[in-house]
Amino acid sequence: MAQEVVEGFKFEQRHGKERVRVARVWRTPQGRHFVVEWRVGITLFSDCVNSYLRDDNSDIVATDTMKNTVYAKAKECSDILSVEDFAILLAKHFVSFYKKVTGAIVNIVEKPWERVIVDGQPHQHGFTLGSEKHTTEAIVQKSGSLQLTSGIEGLSVLKTTQSGFENFIRNKYTALPDTRERILATEVTALWRYSYESLYNLPQKPLYFTDKYLEVKKVLADTFFGPPNRGVYSPSVQNTLYLMAKATLNRFPDIAYVHLKMPNLHFLPVNISSKDGPIVKFEDDVYLPTDEPHGSIEASLSRVWSKL
């Protein structure tokens, strides 16, 4: 955000529109439908200081205009496109269409509508709502510079063994025992930033970023679970998080930065006794699932050459 000196004070400003909801349907000649549902947020950086200092709104892009632009641009998209490409399209429009706008940030969350399978066949126009959400943020400057981030919200994963936690700091406040056998469950929030720094060197392949989103999600899940027949041991959420981020950077050379947040969602062993003896004796079988309170673990990993 640009900083100015106004009447002896440092002043920063921006304005935008949040929670603009839009759905778009595309129909192929063969009768197959495709649908997306997006929640769009827009932030503009512009020279409209006079609107704050005096009765002069002549330099403001109205937030209602921003909202209408979302629908107009969605209408113009005659071909299916990724949420990243739509975010870039919107941000590019604002910095090129308005002389006073120097930069734009567009955030979008995509609702996970997935094609339904009926009698073993993909339905032509039927969809069910999935779980994790696809997110993106495009930051575009009038110069054409770009910062593009994608992400996942709500990727819930769990494994019933091959997890432990041992040899941590102990003191008079510590009650947690060491273990090499526990359930590991988390809800992954992931962000990754692409290395593309200009509007003019983006991949031209249709739906490139949609495919990349699915591939990153697979790498994260595969690293968490390990091979299907034996899994992989996790000595801590921290170690598993690092391996997931590292696998992402190793697999995708055009990703420069990864941030993962992985709360430790606890499954507590159930032991219940009465004065007459055990009612439930825990044998790695009965648990109390709880997410309040929960551990909070997050970290970022980037390439050494990255500017991030």
From Swiss-Prot:
- Upper classification of the organism: Eukaryota, Viridiplantae, Streptophyta, Embryophyta, Tracheophyta
* Main location group: other
Function according to Swiss-Prot or TrEMBL: Catalyzes the oxidation of uric acid to 5-hydroxyisourate, which is further processed to form (S)-allantoin.
Q: Could you tell me which Gene3D superfamilies the record lists for this protein?
A: Urate Oxidase (3.10.270.10)
Q: Might you report a single GO cellular component term?
A: peroxisome
The positions annotated for binding urate are 63-64, 165, 182, 237-238, 264
Active site at 17 (charge relay system), 63 (charge relay system), 266 (charge relay system)
Report if keyword Oxidoreductase is assigned.
yes
Keyword Oxidoreductase set for record: yes
Q: Which CDD domains match?
A: Uricase
State the name under which the record lists this protein.
Answer: Uricase-2
Query: Record's superkingdom?
Result: Eukaryota
Q: What induces it?
A: In root nodules after infection by Rhizobium. Nodule uricase II levels increase from 11 to around 25 days after inoculation, then fall slightly.
What's this protein's family per the entry?
Answer: Belongs to the uricase family.
SUPFAM superfamilies, per database record: Tetrahydrobiopterin biosynthesis enzymes-like (SSF55620)
Broad EC category: oxidoreductase
Query: What keywords were assigned to this record?
Result: Nodulation, Oxidoreductase, Peroxisome, Purine metabolism
Tissue specificity is:
Expressed predominantly in the uninfected cells of the central tissue of the root nodule. Also expressed in the nodule parenchyma cells and vascular tissue, in the roots, stems and leaves of uninfected adult plants, and in the cotyledons, roots and hypocotyls of developing seedlings. Localized to the metaxylem parenchyma cells and phloem fibers of developing roots.
Tell me the pathway.
Purine metabolism; urate degradation; (S)-allantoin from urate: step 1/3
As one GO molecular function, the record gives:
urate oxidase activity
Compartments reported by the entry: Peroxisome
